[in-house]
A protein has these predicted regions:
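Short pre-active-site segment immediately N-terminal to the catalytic Zn-binding motif
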Residues: 2-19, 83-86
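Catalytic Zn2+-binding segment of zinc metalloproteases
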Residues: 15, 25-42, 60
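Membrane-active amphipathic alpha-helices enriched in small hydrophobic residues
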Residues: 45-60, 67-77
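Extracytoplasmic and endomembrane cell-envelope/extracellular-matrix remodeling and assembly machinery
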Residues: 79, 84-268, 294
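Alpha-helical linker/edge segments of TPR/alpha-solenoid repeat scaffolds
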Residues: 141-142, 154-155, 252-259, 283-292, ...
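TPR alpha-solenoid repeat register
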Residues: 204, 238-242, 272, 309, ...
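Alpha-helical adaptor scaffolds
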Residues: 243-256, 260-320, 324, 330
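TPR/TPR-like (Sel1-like) alpha-helical repeat modules
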Residues: 328-358
């Protein structure tokens, strides 16, 4: 499951983002797609029966035949729409409970539906609710407000500095085009003011740094990142995000050494681990590549489902010259992304490489162990693939 950058950019708080994820994950946990298919299977006989009756009626009255066929089709489609709206209400209800139990502000649900209503106000007048796959947005807002309880105020959720900066990052990453980058820098240079809210100023500076970096304007990027670091120095989460941006900016400006110095030696979380590994790989030095490989191996021992870590591990191993392990890491990257076919292809290529190395006398003890792991993983993935292809 992924999150679209546009969603991160449009929400005002992490509570609103969590409300969308809670709703969508409720669809998954309640198996709504499977239930929809089951519902369609139960209504198909009625649709076929309507068509048969229409054919039988055609000999006496063509109009009656058309009416019978259309009536059967309309009844089937209406039943599917009713079922779809019920599933949406169920996802709202269960998602609301999950959202609250996870510690998020339930007002985020109301705020997200209000944004949805605002976005569709010009092309949706609320007519024909019985012909919709989703309940009316006004109905969903009322339902969420009633669940919050009577007498509760609905003040706007305040945007945190960290969220404002991540929304700015999403906006900068959404489009790599020159004109869009120029718009971000123009907004910073023309509209930035000390009178703006702190979160807004942090957002503008963050987006400006990314735009300047994309434009290869190194001096402006470094000057802006210093402004950002000074602005958010009293907010721990915001300061951490700004420090990561400072390091990433140096990396994108082809200065991996400064990137590593900015990060420091203490690595305790995923973002810093990944960024440090990227900087080491960009340095194109054998010693740093070996350090990157060791760091990724340690991280993957505790987080084996991290696709980006597997990809970085593969790159690091290639730089150290360990092609066999690099190919297996690439295969594991495909496995985590549910691409069993791609993983099997990489493992088979690794098998061929191991055979060639063995034939040339270049496969040492560690290589033999790696070849055995590759054989075992290939067998397990091929077995999994056969199970997935079996009919129910």
């Amino acid at each position: 499951m992924g999150v679209h950058l546009g969603l991160i950019a449009v929400v005002s708080s992490r509570d609103e983002l969590a409300s969308v994820m809670a709703h969508e994950l409720s669809h998954v946990t309640q198996r709504h797609i499977a239930r929809m298919q089951d519902q369609q299977g139960r209504t198909t006989p009625f649709l076929i029966a309507g068509m048969i009756l229409g054919v039988l009626a055609a000999s006496r009255s063509p109009d009656a035949a058309g009416a019978v066929m259309m009536g059967g089709t309309a009844g089937t489609v209406q039943g599917q729409l009713n079922f779809s709206r019920d599933m949406e209400r169920e996802a709202d209800r269960l998602g609301f409970n999950v959202h609250a139990q996870a510690g998020f502000d339930s007002q985020g649900f109301v705020g997200m539906f209000q944004k949805l209503q605002q976005a569709s106000r010009l092309n949706d007048n609320g007519n024909y609710p019985y012909l919709r796959s989703h309940p009316l947005t006004t109905e969903r807002i009322g339902d969420m407000q009633s669940r919050l309880g009577l007498g509760k105020t609905f003040a706007p959720v305040e945007t945190s500095i960290e969220h404002a900066m991540m929304a700015a990052r999403a906006r900068a990453l959404m489009s790599p085009y020159v004109d869009d980058m120029q718009k971000l820098t123009d907004v910073l240079e023309k509209d930035f003011s000390p009178e703006l809210p702190l979160a807004k100023r942090a957002s503008m500076l963050y987006a400006g740094v990314m735009a300047y970096t994309q434009q290869r304007r190194a001096a402006q990027a470094r000057q802006t990142i210093n402004q950002l670091l000074q602005l958010v120095r009293e907010d721990p989460a915001g300061l951490r995000a700004a420090q990561w941006l400072a390091a990433d900016t140096e990396r994108r400006l082809n200065n991996p050494t400064q990137c590593l110095q900015t990060l420091g030696a203490k690595v305790v979380d995923r973002a810093r681990v990944v960024l440090q590994t990227q900087c080491r790989l960009d340095a194109k030095q054998a010693a740093l590549a070996a350090q990157a490989s060791d760091a990724m191996q340690l991280w993957l021992a505790q987080h084996p489902r991290d696709a980006i870590a597997w990809d970085l591990s593969s790159q690091a191993l290639l730089q150290t010259g360990d092609r066999l392990r690099a190919m297996r890491a690439d295969a594991e990257f495909h496995v985590v992304r549910w691409d069993e076919v791609g993983a099997i292809d990489r493992l088979r290529a690794a098998q061929e490489l191991a055979k060639q190395l063995s034939k040339d006398g270049k496969l040492d003890r560690a290589g033999n162990m790696e070849a055995s792991i590759i054989d075992s993983r290939l067998r397990s993935l091929e077995r999994l693939r056969r199970e997935l292809l079996q009919p129910y």
